[in-house]
Amino acid sequence: MLHGSRLKTALSKVKLSAVHGPWTRVVGMHHMMKPPGGRKSIPQPLWGGAAKIKGARFTPKGEFDSVYLAWEPITALLEVQALVLMPAGSVPLRTAPWALVTVDGVVSRVLDLTDASSLKALGTNEQEMTGTWVTMKNPPTQELARAAYASGRNRCNQLWFCETSWGNEPCRIS
């Protein structure tokens, strides 16, 4: 993957897309039963603070909120399973059970990392975006997300990558 100013320049030129749901999100039941993060509000199944607190594939620990969504429920479940079961995974098993939430809408200005031309322009590939990240000090996925967030071009939107394929359709998660 490109780094530093080269990555920043490439991100400024990559075409952003608009996408629409429905998507699936996996949420710990504790977020469905009470407000997240000790807040005094209603429960928030779209709260993105857990990724900020714990760190996630595209979310450097402590830097910004992220909401992870998947086209297919199995993809959302597989990503959570990776967090739970990997050595040094950031989600303890005691957070189970999980709830699947369907989210529908249109999101604009999405950096589509399933697009081969976008990956090429950023000097990366599907393997780098979907590979193991938990044990890395500075995973390329988080470096890319940090640069994309800093660019402001797609702030409040998602980064997309191809997690795996089921049948003939790629499963996307953001």
Language-model segment annotations:
Residues 1-57, 84-174:
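Active-site and NAD+-binding cores of ADP-ribose-processing enzymes
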Residues 55-87:
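Extended catalytic/binding region for NAD+/ADP-ribose chemistry, centered on the ART fold
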